[in-house]
């Protein structure tokens, strides 16, 4: 499985919480225009939209910021994923990651568990579970 996407997020809260748990909630939307699923029957090409990602960014560290995230969305593919099921699937995921902050831009690295399932749209619904390493490049915009 391989994918490329873009994310836009909004910080929802001011920092709060005690000690090392101090952080803030972020809501994000992912658009994944390139989603490849390599299967025994061939490669399925798809598009993903994840309108729900809720993330807790820890705010105590300054240059390396850990986070965890829960999210979900929809995956549309040109072939059945898994084979014999559906062209439309739903995704749910959880991730642990780090933002490496610089003055203007940042890098991110995360480990993500993702479940892909058609939620009963087809009579066959075996689902796929994946563990992914994701790398990202971005910019945090600050509003004043």
Range-by-range predicted roles:
Residues 23-31, 66-72, 107-111, 131-135:
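Transmembrane beta-strands of outer-membrane beta-barrel proteins
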Residues 1-4, 43-50, 64, 86-92, ...:
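Residues that define the transmembrane beta-barrel architecture of outer-membrane proteins
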Residues 31-37, 72-78, 100, 113-117, ...:
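Transmembrane beta-strands of outer-membrane beta-barrel pores
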Residues 12-25, 59-65, 101-107, 142-144:
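Short loop/turn motifs that connect adjacent beta-strands in outer-membrane beta-barrel proteins
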Residues 39-41, 78-84, 119-125:
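Extracellular loop and loop/strand-boundary signature of outer-membrane beta-barrel proteins
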Residues 128-144:
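Outer-membrane beta-barrel "beta-signal"
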Residues 6, 52-54, 68, 94-96, ...:
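Membrane-embedded beta-strands of outer-membrane beta-barrel proteins
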Residues 1-51:
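Glycine- and aromatic-enriched membrane insertion/assembly motifs of diderm outer-membrane
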């Amino acid at each position: 499985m391989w994918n490329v996407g873009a994310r836009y997020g909004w910080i929802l809260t001011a920092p709060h919480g005690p000690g090392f748990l101090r952080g803030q909630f972020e809501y994000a939307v992912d658009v994944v225009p390139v989603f490849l699923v390599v299967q025994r029957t061939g490669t399925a090409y798809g598009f993903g939209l994840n309108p729900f990602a809720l993330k807790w960014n820890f705010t105590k560290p300054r240059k390396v910021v850990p986070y965890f995230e829960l999210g979900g969305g929809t995956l549309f593919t040109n072939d059945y994923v898994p084979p014999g099921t559906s062209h439309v699937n739903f995704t749910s995921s959880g991730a642990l990651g780090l933002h490496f902050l610089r003055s203007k831009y940042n890098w991110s690295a995360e480990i993500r568990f993702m479940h892909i399932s058609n939620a009963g749209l087809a009579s066959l619904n075996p689902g796929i579970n994946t563990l992914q390493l994701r790398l990202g490049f971005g910019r945090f915009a600050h509003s004043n």
